[in-house]
């Protein structure tokens, strides 16, 4: 297994939808989560870069698909945050369409990291993301973020509860706790990404450009 240097991750581009993304080759691992789940903080902690992914003070600001390259043909994808109450309904629907389309049609997408606040896990949209991924044979890592907000016993109880709940999806779904503040769970995240990037088959360029 290759240990990638995530500190070398750099921003490639932003796209409003799947049609504007670069060619569907290599391996992509996407990060998804509700607008306040700590997605940007997790990406910044993973790569040890303070501002790789912009942490917005206004949840719901990240409306684009953001691509980052870790190494040649190995990319991390920051998907638009979902479920923020103050975003207009029309925009919410647009994002959900873009998310669904990306998860179902992007062949190079081979792993999905779903981030949830450990205090409020498995909301409807979180479950929908996991369901979409499992239906598309995409491996899932659930990160229960802001784990430092709970005492050790409560943290363990939440972890066990979510691990039990995801069995119902009948897919490759792993659950771990994570804290950007305390750097907790970062090694497990890196190990999982290394495994995915090492063991999964990169998508090659096709003649018709699909």
UniProtKB/Swiss-Prot annotation:
Q: Sorted alphabetically, which PROSITE patterns does this protein's record hold?
A: G_ENGB (PS51706)
| UniProt domain EngB-type G: residue ranges | 25-199
Which terms in the GO cellular component ontology are assigned?
cytosol
Residue sites binding GTP per the record: 33-40, 60-64, 78-81, 145-148, 178-180
GO annotation terms (biological process): division septum assembly
Give me the residues that bind Mg(2+), please: 40, 62
- SUPFAM superfamilies noted in UniProt: P-loop containing nucleoside triphosphate hydrolases
A Pfam family this protein belongs to? MMR_HSR1
Any one GO MF term held by the record is: metal ion binding
NCBIfam families from the UniProt entry: GTPase_YsxC
Describe its function: Necessary for normal cell division and for the maintenance of normal septation.
**Which protein are we looking at?**
Probable GTP-binding protein EngB
Higher taxonomy: Bacteria, Pseudomonadati, Pseudomonadota, Gammaproteobacteria, Enterobacterales
Gene label: engB
